[in-house]
């Protein structure tokens, strides 16, 4: 583990003693042949697209209520939810209805499944992490395609995976500690398209230069 995933003082939550690596508990190598990072879609479309590759098991009412608040605060924005679970019509309909119950028209939602994920991510401006259980590999895939995300740091360790990734990347400013702050940080990212375009253009290089993709360094840390 690492200090962001298992902060000092949380030892009582574990049955074993946490062994903290000095930089990151994660190291990433993209699978297959990822697409090149494209220009920010919102610059051409005129609206922000949020997106997540999470599985349905991570969705919950508290989480989608926060996402509904986010969509309400960013006019015209849309949400893409892409995972194999949502290839089932009954699962798609369940979550479409839950968003509608929160005041979000289904026309603003694209829930389904396409693979490989790289093409989906090329159409998204900002990635969404889940809580109280954070996403995992899909956060790294999103960053690799130039998409920033905000995480809500919760209970170690499944609630602090996003914080670990962002700390290793060098963007702790995208870590939130309350639901209000989570939404506020996402709104701030969505409200500055020139800055968001710069983030997208440089994020893959930042990631490649970080501990998240330093495989030899990770091996040395473990040794």
PLM features per residue range, with description:
Residues 54-56, 69-72, 82-84, 89-97, ...:
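C-terminal amphipathic helix plus adjacent low-complexity
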Residues 18, 108-110, 172-173:
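Short, conserved active-site loop motifs that form the nucleotide-linked donor/cofactor pocket
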Residues 23-115, 122:
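Conserved catalytic-core segment of nucleotide-activated headgroup transferases in glycan assembly
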Residues 122-126, 130-215:
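Catalytic binding pocket for nucleotide-activated donors in carbohydrate/polymer assembly enzymes
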